[in-house]
């Protein structure tokens, strides 16, 4: 097993200018790239004989709009992939920043890693990130009629619609949310009455 420093140097050399940044922190390597280099970076990480990251073990969307409880200055959305090289016993993270915050789109990597199929559908469903050339990009966790993308940080906690069974229509129907926010008043316990004394 090669060291993290060796992996850092190899990845930097192999990817060259395609990688916007190669970061070594906390014993992990993260490659940050632009959307236009995403496919070539993922292909190089899989196919290069010194790297051989043959497995995509996770892919997710991230909404950085309020990262670390403060306003974020960069791009709002990113797609983060975790790759594994069984041959070299190494892991690497790839982060691609989505260029348009209003209509987030990146290329699909299903043709490179077929395990990305449902992960990309999940990122689309929960964050609204579109994946160009995905073979079946549709919702996977929420209803087909669901409004919005629930993991976006600007999505309301109570949602927009709720579903219930309508006895008259004998079916499940959607209606606007009827939940009223509650005011929670903390209960004060006085020492003299504490414990039933």
Swiss-Prot record:
It is found in: Cell inner membrane. Its EC number is 7.1.1.-. It catalyses: a quinone + NADH + 5 H(+)(in) = a quinol + NAD(+) + 4 H(+)(out). Coiled coil: none annotated. InterPro entries: NADH_DH_suC (IPR010218), NADH_quin_OxRdtase_su_C/D-like (IPR037232), NADH_UbQ_OxRdtase_30kDa_su (IPR001268), NADH_UbQ_OxRdtase_CS (IPR020396). Keywords: Cell inner membrane, Cell membrane, Membrane, NAD, Quinone, Translocase, Transport, Ubiquinone. It is an enzyme of class 7 (translocase). The keyword Membrane applies. It is a peripheral membrane protein. NDH-1 is composed of 14 different subunits. Subunits NuoB, C, D, E, F, and G constitute the peripheral sector of the complex. Belongs to the complex I 30 kDa subunit family. NDH-1 shuttles electrons from NADH, via FMN and iron-sulfur (Fe-S) centers, to quinones in the respiratory chain. The immediate electron acceptor for the enzyme in this species is believed to be ubiquinone. Couples the redox reaction to proton translocation (for every two electrons transferred, four hydrogen ions are translocated across the cytoplasmic membrane), and thus conserves the redox energy in a proton gradient. NCBIfam families: NuoC_fam (TIGR01961), PRK06074.1-1 (NF004730). This is NADH-quinone oxidoreductase subunit C. The lineage of its organism: Bacteria, Pseudomonadati, Pseudomonadota, Betaproteobacteria, Neisseriales.
């Amino acid at each position: 097993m090669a060291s993290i420093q060796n992996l850092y140097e190899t990845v930097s050399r192999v990817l060259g200018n395609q990688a916007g940044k190669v970061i070594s922190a906390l014993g992990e390597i993260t490659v940050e790239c632009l959307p236009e280099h995403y496919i070539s970076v993922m292909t190089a990480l899989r196919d290069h004989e010194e790297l051989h990251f043959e497995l995509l073990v996770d892919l997710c969307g991230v909404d950085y709009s309020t990262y670390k409880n403060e306003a974020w200055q960069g791009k709002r959305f990113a797609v983060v992939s975790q790759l594994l090289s069984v041959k070299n016993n190494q892991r690497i993270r790839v982060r691609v920043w989505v260029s348009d915050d209003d209509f987030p789109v990146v290329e699909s990597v299903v043709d490179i890693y077929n395990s990305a199929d449902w992960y990309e559908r999940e990122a689309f469903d929960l964050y609204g990130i579109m994946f160009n050339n995905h073979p079946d990009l549709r919702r996977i966790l929420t209803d087909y009629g669901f409004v919005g993308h629930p993991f976006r940080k600007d999505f309301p906690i109570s949602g927009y619609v709720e579903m219930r069974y309508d006895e008259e229509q004998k079916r499940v129907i959607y209606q606007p949310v009827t939940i009223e926010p509650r005011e929670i008043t903390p209960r004060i316990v006085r020492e003299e009455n504490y414990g039933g004394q």
